[in-house]
């Protein structure tokens, strides 16, 4: 009994003074391990008679339980202490300046495209798409281009090699090709825009070999030039968010429209007129080429360059800057993901 009490007292003293989990584990082995002090006491059971063995075994088990409980309590205390020390060491100093967060931005062409789509959607226009590689029928013939029209020549259009003698293929020069495919494969009425890349052999401050274009088409019964002028006028004023913009429609010529017009705008009375888009009533030959009766259905079409509208709205001087990938230039505009317009929020950044 005295030896058991002495062992318990010694164990409690050592465990009480221990300062870390490593030393606590060593004391656990010292008292409860295979060759520990308590295990040594258990070995004495073999030399005792049955009654003494029973009494001594009960006392040894109680000793073992008390030491285990003492170790467990101390272990919890030390673990909490170590956790607090770690948290204190890892504490974030909120006064330290944060790391600069690099975030991408929306390209001005994408931003402008989304704004254009948003405006046209208010007039009930949907979006149609088509292939970038086209044949001459969809790109020229169906749109009433004569066989000797200059636009068909190599110096204006990118033709694909190896197709000259069979079915000439080319990079589309306008998204009007989407209109032809949609009218061939569907039935009127139509009201949609076609947005996408177009390609022409030209490069200077106001032209690039590849550019983005939106072309719109409306086909229905009793459509006239008044409808066209209304849509274009409201579209221009909505996009530039200026109800006082002046517009003028100048007579022009396009193979696929008759009559045709160029649209000029000026923001203020003292500004110069700026040409922004072409439009007109769909030519009867175009309707005939896609199987639509021009005596029953009429329509209007218009086309505009996305880059051109972006340059006017965001005051960009050189068209080529859109494609140079200059991060400083892109950062200057810094359109964020939340700047993409929606019908509820409007266009203003």
Curated annotation (Swiss-Prot):
SUPFAM superfamilies recorded for this chain? Class II aaRS and biotin synthetases, tRNA-binding arm
- Matching Gene3D superfamilies: Bira Bifunctional Protein, Domain 2
How the cofactor is bound: the record states: Binds 2 magnesium ions per tetramer.
For this chain, the annotated S-S bridges are none
Q: Which residues bind Mg(2+)?
A: 258
As its record notes, the protein acts as a catalyst of:
tRNA(Phe) + L-phenylalanine + ATP = L-phenylalanyl-tRNA(Phe) + AMP + diphosphate + H(+)
**CDD domains referenced in this protein's UniProt entry, alphabetically:** PheRS_alpha_core
Major place of localization?
Answer: cytoplasm
Name its co-factor(s). Answer: Mg(2+)
Q: Name one GO cellular component term.
A: cytoplasm
Documented EC number(s):
6.1.1.20
Localization, per the record, is: Cytoplasm
The UniProt record lists the keyword Ribosomal protein: no
Keyword check for ATP-binding, yes or no: yes
Provide the GO MF annotations for this entry: ATP binding; magnesium ion binding; phenylalanine-tRNA ligase activity; tRNA binding
**Uppermost EC category:** ligase
Regarding protein family, the annotation reads:
Belongs to the class-II aminoacyl-tRNA synthetase family. Phe-tRNA synthetase alpha subunit type 1 subfamily.
What binding partners and quaternary form does the record give? Tetramer of two alpha and two beta subunits.
List the protein's name.
Phenylalanine--tRNA ligase alpha subunit
Task: Report the source organism.
Answer: Rickettsia canadensis (strain McKiel)
Gene, per the UniProt record: pheS
């Amino acid at each position: 009994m005295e030896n058991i009490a002495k062992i318990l007292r010694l164990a409690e003293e050592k465990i009480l003074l221990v300062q870390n989990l490593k030393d606590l584990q060593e004391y656990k082995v010292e008292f409860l391990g295979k060759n520990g002090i308590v295990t040594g006491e258990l070995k004495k059971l073999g030399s005792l008679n049955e009654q003494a063995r029973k009494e001594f075994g009960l006392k040894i088990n109680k000793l073992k339980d008390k030491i285990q409980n003492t170790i467990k309590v101390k272990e919890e205390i030390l673990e909490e202490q170590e956790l607090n020390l770690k948290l204190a060491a890892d504490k974030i100093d909120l006064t330290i300046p944060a790391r600069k967060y690099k975030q991408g931005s929306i390209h001005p062409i994408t931003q402008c495209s989304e704004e254009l789509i948003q405006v046209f959607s208010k007039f009930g226009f949907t979006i149609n798409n088509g292939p970038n590689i086209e044949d001459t029928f969809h790109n020229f013939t169906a749109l009433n281009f004569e066989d000797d029209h200059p636009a068909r020549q190599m110096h204006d259009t990118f033709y694909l090699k190896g197709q000259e003698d069979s079915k000439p293929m080319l990079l589309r020069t306008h998204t009007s090709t989407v209109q032809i495919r949609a009218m061939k494969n569907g039935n009127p009425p139509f009201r949609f825009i076609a947005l996408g890349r177009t390609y022409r052999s030209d490069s200077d401050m106001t032209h690039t070999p590849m550019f983005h274009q939106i072309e719109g088409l409306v086909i229905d019964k009793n459509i006239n030039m008044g409808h066209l002028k209304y849509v274009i006028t409201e579209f221009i004023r909505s996009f530039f968010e200026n109800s006082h913009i002046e517009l003028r429609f100048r007579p022009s010529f396009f193979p696929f429209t008759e009559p045709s017009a160029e649209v000029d705008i000026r923001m203020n009375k003292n500004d110069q007129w700026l040409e922004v888009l072409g439009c007109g009533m769909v030519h009867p030959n175009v309707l005939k080429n896609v199987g639509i009766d021009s005596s029953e259905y009429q329509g209007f079409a218009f086309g505009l360059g996305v880059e051109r509208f972006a340059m006017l709205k965001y005051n960009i001087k050189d068209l080529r800057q859109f494609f140079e990938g200059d991060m400083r230039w892109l950062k200057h505009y810094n359109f964020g993901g939340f700047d993409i317009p929606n019908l509820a929020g409007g266009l203003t950044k």
